[in-house]
């Protein structure tokens, strides 16, 4: 992948050297989980204290809405669980997990969605989102927008309000961000799918 294929405008508040360092820790694995997919691996970012610190500072600096415009952070399984709780703690907010189907005790609500490589379903506990609670949905990446839109639907079914979406990476050429409509969004790094 050429460096010119990577856009790091969401990292503009961390400086060019830190942005380059962070991007250098993101691996690209062709053909995983199936042929034709370019998997973007963030695990090396988490294993590197400097890169993880840069990432969390950048997520906080690039919020798509003011910190007072939401009450809770929602993280999507699985890698949204890595960044969502850390961001929530930095911001003094609570955290809500949206999980794969069958992983939460009753009572739950579920929503099916399409992945770039298949179909799946996710759930939320009905007692964690209350009427009118405003949330920021956080995930590691947006591709088709299926997961993010399913989470939005779950929050709204529970009576919550989605204030915005924050992603570490956006895969371009798939129009996932467009699928979110007029919601405020942010992404730190854009790479071609």
Curated annotation (Swiss-Prot):
Classification via PROSITE patterns: PUR_PYR_PR_TRANSFER (PS00103)
Principal EC category: transferase
Listed EC numbers: 2.4.2.7
GO molecular function, one term: adenine binding
Recorded metabolic or biological pathway in which this protein acts: Purine metabolism; AMP biosynthesis via salvage pathway; AMP from adenine: step 1/1
Main location: cytoplasm
Localization: Cytoplasm
Transmembrane segments: none
Assigned keywords, A-Z: Cytoplasm, Glycosyltransferase, Purine salvage, Transferase
Catalysed reaction equations from the record: AMP + diphosphate = 5-phospho-alpha-D-ribose 1-diphosphate + adenine
GO CC, any one term: cytoplasm
Record GO biological process: adenine salvage; AMP salvage; purine ribonucleoside salvage
CDD domains linked to this entry: PRTases_typeI
PANTHER family named among the record's database cross-references: ADENINE PHOSPHORIBOSYLTRANSFERASE (PTHR32315:SF3)
NCBIfam families in UniProt: apt, PRK02304.1-3, PRK02304.1-5
Function of the protein: Catalyzes a salvage reaction resulting in the formation of AMP, that is energically less costly than de novo synthesis.
Family the UniProt entry places it in: Belongs to the purine/pyrimidine phosphoribosyltransferase family.
Subunit structure: Homodimer.
Protein name per the record: Adenine phosphoribosyltransferase
Organism: Bifidobacterium adolescentis (strain ATCC 15703 / DSM 20083 / NCTC 11814 / E194a)
Phylogenetic classification of the source organism: Bacteria, Bacillati, Actinomycetota, Actinomycetes, Bifidobacteriales
């Amino acid at each position: 992948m050429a460096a010119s294929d990577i856009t790091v405008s969401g990292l503009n508040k961390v400086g060019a050297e830190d942005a380059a360092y962070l991007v250098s820790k993101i691996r690209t694995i062709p053909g995983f989980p199936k042929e034709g997919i370019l998997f973007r691996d963030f695990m090396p970012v988490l294993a590197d204290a400097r890169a993880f610190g840069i990432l969390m500072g950048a997520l906080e600096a690039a919020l798509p809405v003011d910190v007072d415009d939401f009450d809770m952070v929602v993280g999507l399984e699985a890698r949204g669980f890595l960044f969502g709780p850390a961001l929530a703690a930095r911001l003094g907010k609570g955290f809500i997990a949206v999980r794969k189907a069958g992983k939460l005790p009753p009572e739950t609500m579920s929503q099916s969605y399409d992945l770039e490589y298949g179909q799946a379903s996710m759930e939320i506990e009905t007692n964690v989102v209350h009427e009118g609670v405003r949330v920021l949905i956080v995930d590691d990446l947006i591709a088709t927008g299926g997961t993010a839109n399913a989470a939005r639907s779950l929050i709204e079914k529970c009576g919550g309000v989605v204030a915005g979406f924050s992603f570490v990476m956006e895969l371009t050429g798939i129009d996932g961000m467009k699928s979110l409509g007029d919601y405020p969004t942010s992404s730190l790094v854009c790479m071609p799918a």
